[in-house]
Amino acid sequence: MATFHTVRDAVKLFDAGISGGKHLNKGQEEGVLVEETNLCLWNKEVNKLKEKIKNAVKTKIEALLELEEAKKTVEQLSQELGIKRNMINDEKDLDLSSSVRVVTSELGVAKESIHRVAEEESELCMLMESLKLELQNVEKAHSELKEIEQRERDHQAIEDLKKETKDAKTQLSLLEEELKIAVFEAQEAKDAEEHARERLNVAVLESDFRSLAVVKESAAEELTETEALRACRDETLKTLEMSEREIEDIKAATQDALKKAEMAQEATIVVDVELKRRRKAASRILAESKMCAKSTKEVLKSKPRSSSKEGCLVKC
């Protein structure tokens, strides 16, 4: 993997990588991973730059110490120069010119040292400002990358929510079909009850020559079976009415959840929980409808036995 001499080169490379588009797709996920790896390398470079800043500050402190030492040296030399001037005044036989040249040379060296320290301090300040600017650019690029990843996660969450809503609609359609079948079976049970009543009336009219006890016993059995069939039918219709109301509530809640999902992406978690609860209620309604349909079928299966009894009564 390529390394970077400066953070500025890394930031330029990162800007060139993300300037091609604002949104990521599945084909660019590998590129995002590479950019995250580059970001780690940039963080290492930033840490190195911070270390350089620390060293620069340390060098600055050392330069300031050298400057203080140079100032002390200048003061000491000035004092020595004063002393030597006094000595020159007191001792005119000494070589004044040589002493002055030595002191002047030392003063020149001190001035050069002070000038060099000032230049190094200026360079260090410029370097620190440049490093701060590069660090800000890296942090800005990192923030933009995080925003892109967050937008991608939000988009995926919305797609998942739409898929779950579609599944919920499919389940509602299945429930409606089951409900229609149950209503049809209940209607068949009602027709069977009417048919049983008619046959019972015919059997009663045709049984004038039978004994009264036999007629009463047969009629009681038919009425008992008819009452059971009517109770089962009423219970089935009542359950179906409740199922229809609950299905309408589920539809209304589903539409409300869809509106909430379109109005705000932040409500995805709430809608998900609501859809799960509604699906659970829909499953319960389906189970109850199946149980009612099963009981209706069992009652319908028991009808042939009563019909055979009526046939026997007619023959008698």
Curated annotation (Swiss-Prot):
Stretches the record annotates as Disordered: 295-316
Positions in coiled-coil regions: 42-90, 119-195, 233-266
Domain of life: Eukaryota
Transmembrane annotation, as ranges: none
Keyword vocabulary terms for this entry: Coiled coil
Sequence similarity: Belongs to the WEB family.
Name assigned to this protein: WEB family protein At3g13190
Organism: Arabidopsis thaliana
Classification of source organism: Eukaryota, Viridiplantae, Streptophyta, Embryophyta, Tracheophyta
